[in-house]
């Protein structure tokens, strides 16, 4: 039976992952992931992290299934850099039984190729929040309503957008950081924008500015302040959702994250 997205969400408490196999581990065929959990969340990125926390706040126990690994910053070389990419950047999980099966590695990004374009997506606890630029731009009302005419932009503007920024800890770049030598290119860009007759804005960004200040002061090795954050941030300055939404959900005792676990099928009970 094929479920629509809406019907799937409505029946989420009755959905089981029929074949949930931790990578490199065996699974118990006599136990469904829903035996002890009322809801299953597939993926731990932005949407999955928010769902886990909101369910926990409602008193609903959930299990978050994530195919990728948990990345914890330890030292200054947890993540690959744009200057020195290595296998940590790539999700490389060959089909079972293939000749390259032994080369499997749960890296940060999976490349999905189509006939005309290839796309990359996060494959880790925290999902895309670890591997995006950290900029949180609020769409203008006309653009938002052209895509979501059935949603209230005023509610999003007054309640939900501010709530997200507060939860993540996102804010525009502070003036003292923008004035530093590390951000001379940004200042040049803003001057060029103004010279062209446009208005340069400073959108909210999901970084811990105090950590970036330490980078600029030379107290810790530079990472975010030199643009090294697309593949994770080795100074831990990026406020990814595993450090806020998902952390709070797990701390409530009502959410469990099961990493290195891939969902292969969804069936209706």
Ranges and model annotations:
Residues 1-7:
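N-terminal secretory signal peptides
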Residues 2, 49, 117, 187, ...:
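Residue-level marker for well-ordered alpha-helical positions
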Residues 6, 54-55, 120-123, 190-193, ...:
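A general structural signal for short secondary-structure junctions and capping/turn motifs
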Residues 7-27:
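N-terminal export signals
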Residues 30-147, 151-153:
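N-terminal glycine-rich phosphate/pyrophosphate-binding loop and immediately adjacent elements
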Residues 69, 79, 207, 263-264:
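Conserved beta-strand edge residues that scaffold enzyme active sites
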Residues 150-262:
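Conserved redox-cofactor binding core of oxidoreductases
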Residues 265-269:
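Conserved beta-strand-loop-beta-strand element in the redox core of flavoprotein oxidoreductases
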């Amino acid at each position: 039976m094929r479920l629509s997205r809406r019907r799937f969400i409505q029946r989420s408490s009755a959905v089981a992952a029929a074949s949930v196999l931790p990578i490199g581990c065996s699974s118990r065929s006599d136990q469904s992931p829903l035996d002890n959990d009322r809801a299953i969340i597939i993926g731990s990125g932005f949407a999955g992290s928010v769902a886990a926390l909101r369910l926990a706040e409602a008193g609903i126990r959930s299990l978050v299934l994530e195919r990728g690994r948990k990345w914890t910053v330890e030292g200054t070389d947890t993540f690959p850099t744009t200057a020195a990419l290595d296998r940590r950047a790539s999700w490389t999980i060959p089909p079972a039984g293939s000749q390259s099966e032994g080369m499997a590695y749960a890296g940060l990004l999976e490349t999905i190729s189509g006939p005309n374009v290839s796309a990359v997506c996060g494959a880790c606890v925290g999902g895309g929040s670890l591997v995006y630029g950290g900029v949180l731009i609020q769409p203008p009302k006309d653009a938002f309503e052209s895509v979501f005419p059935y949603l209230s932009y005023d509610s999003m503007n007054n309640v939900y957008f501010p709530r997200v920024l507060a939860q993540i800890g996102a804010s525009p770049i502070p003036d003292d950081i923008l004035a530093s030598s590390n951000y001379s290119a940004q200042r040049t860009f803003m001057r060029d924008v103004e010279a062209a007759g446009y208005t340069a804005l400073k959108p909210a960004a999901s970084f811990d500015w105090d950590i970036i200040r330490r980078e600029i002061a030379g107290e810790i090795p530079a990472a975010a302040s030199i643009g090294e954050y697309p593949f994770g941030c080795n100074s831990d300055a990026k406020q990814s959702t595993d450090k806020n939404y998902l952390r709070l959900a797990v701390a409530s005792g009502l959410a469990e994250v099961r990493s290195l676990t891939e969902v292969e099928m969804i069936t209706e009970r």
